[in-house]
Amino acid sequence: MSMPLPMKLRTRLFLSISALITVSLFGLLLGLFSVMQLGRAQEQRMSHHYATIEVSQQLRQLLGDQLVILLRETPDGQALERSQNDFRRVLEQGRANTVDSAEQAALDGVRDAYLQLQAHTPALLEAPMVDNDGFSEAFNGLRLRLQDLQQLALAGISDAETSARHRAYLVAGLLGLVGVAILLIGFVTAHSIARRFGAPIETLARAADRIGEGDFDVTLPMTNVAEVGQLTRRFGLMAEALRQYRKTSVEEVLSGERRLQAVLDSIDDGLVIFDNQGRIEHANPVAIRQLFVSNDPHGKRIDEILSDVDVQEAVEKALLGEVQDEAMPDLVVDVAGESRLLAWSLYPVTHPGGHSVGAVLVVRDVTEQRAFERVRSEFVLRASHELRTPVTGMQMAFSLLRERLDFPAESREADLIQTVDEEMSRLVLLINDLLNFSRYQTGMQKLELASCDLVDLLTQAQQRFIPKGEARRVSLQLELGDELPRLQLDRLQIERVIDNLLENALRHSSEGGQIHLQARRQGDRVLIAVEDNGEGIPFSQQGRIFEPFVQVGRKKGGAGLGLELCKEIIQLHGGRIAVRSQPGQGARFYMLLPV
């Protein structure tokens, strides 16, 4: 048995709507035809009855005229004859035009009564009317006949109105039945369409729910609707493709997750992953050992298992998408009764759409590193103190020796003496830098704070370096914001920071370059920046540039302590210093000082 060809949804809807429209038009035409027929019949009947009333009125008028003629002293026979002829003519016209049998019989009665009246009329021309009783009876009989005719016509009009009203009710009932039929047909059609089209769609929806739950063994409905059938076939193809994809890809995904889990668990740093609600999704063994010890962190918030306020605030900021742009103080934790120092940093994880989806906390045990740095600082301090006295003595002795020696200016000996003097001066500066660095590292350096005018401070710094810039053909521009406040600063130390930044900018600027010395207020802080368009700083070096003994760029100078000293000075003032740079496009060092 062959399955009927599927009919398109558009065709089904067209046929259903066409059937409704056809029934509606049939009912409308039937109503119009009935109303027109009713009106035409009513008009004909009313016109006939009104014509009868008009005939009755004319006959009564003519009868009255004849009576007036007969009542005269000398009746006018000719006038009477004309009136009689008119009476007969009107009567015959009425009889000819009437279609109602009752009215026809009434008109016949009027004719007979008038003939009787005419039989007594000649005698009236010779004797008075009062002496003729037969005429009076005939006249009264005719008058009553005319009254009956008029009453009959009025009754016909009333009957016609009643009949028209009944027929109108009938037409209204028929139209109501047609309307009910249309509603029933529409309801049945809509229900049929909804059942035929809704059932397979509901089945597809249930199948989609099962697929969403991971069950791909679904039964799809068969239908003879072309569009729904096509949708069902494509849905089946999709389900089969998903089944195959799951079969081939789930293991790969799980394998990839296991590999990623192994990588996260094998790195030396502690790693904690937060979801967008601040709850811990994953912590590798190193992080659990360093931070949480005996607590299971999964599903908990950081403030439930770690009391450090800085870490809690940093997690909240990272979940808001804020990037941590400065080093945070080491985290002190107690592990197996031993105090450990952990360096940590937080990184927000954002969706391509821009909203936050979580954060990542990275921790590293720096206990040994900090101990080494402390030993190094102590060694540098002691070595600097031990070296400063003999080196200073050697420099003074060499200066006295140089004054006693007299070599020609162009001689080899003069060049050697000049080289030794420069290197000894450089060595003294290095020892002084080491001493200063050690003082800052050990907290021995104290600030001498005083109210400072930033405009005057930066203007003098510009004036100090303009000659050096002109010698290198580098322009130095000062850009000051409005209403810079006075700050409590150690002016000598801040001048040292600005001079160091300007010196570095000059060293790394090409001929024809530009340096901008800027200052402006930002809320409760003042930003001071030195920006150049020189060679820039490689990305790999930007994170280490403020570490001691680190030098970057092709042009070296000093011992690599300048930026470390700048950082220490700014931190003592309660501020911070940072850098932004694009290799080949220059660098911008900026510091933020509290107001």
Curated annotation (Swiss-Prot):
It catalyses: ATP + protein L-histidine = ADP + protein N-phospho-L-histidine. Changing H385 to K/Q: Loss of autophosphorylation. Residues 195-247 form the HAMP domain. Pfam families: HAMP (PF00672), HATPase_c (PF02518), HisKA (PF00512), KinB_sensor (PF16767), PAS_4 (PF08448). The chain crosses the membrane at residues 13-33, 168-188. It is a multi-pass membrane protein. It is found in: Cell inner membrane. This is Alginate biosynthesis sensor protein KinB. Keywords: Alginate biosynthesis, ATP-binding, Cell inner membrane, Cell membrane, Kinase, Membrane, Nucleotide-binding, Phosphoprotein, Sensory transduction, Transferase, Transmembrane, Transmembrane helix. It comes from Pseudomonas aeruginosa. It is an enzyme of class 2 (transferase). Its EC number is 2.7.13.3. Changing D532E: Loss of autophosphorylation. Changing D532N: Residual autophosphorylation. Residues 34-167 are periplasmic. GO terms for molecular function: ATP binding; phosphorelay sensor kinase activity. The modification Phosphohistidine is found at H385. Residues 258-323 form the PAS domain.
